[in-house]
């Protein structure tokens, strides 16, 4: 929204100023989208519903995002980017590979389960196969490659077995969302450590 020389803001105003909300409009849209996409479903959620949940008019929403796809893409990338950045750091360290693999698993589970909404469930949406989400898929592939590299360092597996164990470990980590959803009151840190222990057993490390 623009500001006149006299200090008056011009442009489309927010439909509702939600009391106690200090986030910027884009963050509020992402929060609203996360809730609606995971509770109602992506296809069943309209841009109008997202805007209203964020406390603004639908037309105002387009000042901040291009639409539902942009919101979904950013939400998906938020589940991968922190773990990918950490994986790159761990790959560069000289600690035992087994310890680094355990730490990546633990941290990744905390990212996936630490949020208020089950964003990992969005991975299964058919829309994610579209070109708009290529960046997310590339980041996810790079993260999986980091897992493979650490499993390879921590074990002496042949390529075929290495690929299988990597698939199983990666599947365990991404699948924990469903387990966590069945008991959301379980402490995430405890759950993350237990999952990392299980991942090492699966890898044979």
Name every feature range the model reports, one short phrase each.
Residues 100-103, 109-134, 148, 178:
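Amphipathic alpha-helical segments used for helix-helix packing
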Residues 28, 32, 36-70, 74:
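Helix-turn-helix
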Residues 1-12, 144-157, 172, 178-205:
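C-terminal peripheral helix-coil segments that are non-catalytic and often amphipathic
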Residues 28, 99-107, 164-172, 190, ...:
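Amphipathic alpha-helical interaction segments
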Residues 81-84, 130-156, 162-167, 190-193:
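Amphipathic alpha-helical packing segments from all-alpha helical-bundle domains
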Residues 74, 85-114:
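Hydrophobic alpha-helical connector segments
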């Amino acid at each position: 929204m623009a500001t006149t020389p006299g200090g008056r803001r011009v442009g489309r105003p927010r439909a509702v100023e939600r009391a106690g909300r200090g986030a910027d409009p884009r963050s509020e849209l992402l929060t609203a989208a996360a809730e609606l996409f995971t509770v109602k479903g992506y296809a069943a959620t309209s841009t109008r519903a997202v805007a209203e949940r964020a406390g603004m008019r639908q037309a105002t929403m387009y000042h901040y995002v291009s639409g539902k796809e942009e919101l979904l893409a950013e939400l998906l990338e938020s589940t991968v980017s922190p773990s990918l950045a950490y994986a790159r750091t761990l790959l560069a360290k000289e600690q035992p590979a087994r310890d680094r693999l355990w730490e990546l698993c633990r941290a990744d589970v905390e990212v996936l389960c630490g949020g208020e909404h089950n964003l990992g469930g969005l991975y299964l949406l058919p829309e994610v196969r579209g070109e708009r989400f290529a960046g997310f898929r590339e980041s996810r592939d790079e993260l999986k490659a980091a897992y493979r590299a650490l499993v390879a360092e921590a074990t002496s597996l042949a390529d075929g077995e290495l690929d299988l164990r990597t698939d199983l470990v990666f599947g365990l980590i991404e699948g924990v969302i469903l387990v966590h959803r069945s008991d959301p009151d379980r402490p995430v840190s405890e759950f993350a450590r237990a999952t990392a222990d299980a991942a090492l057993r699966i890898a044979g490390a």
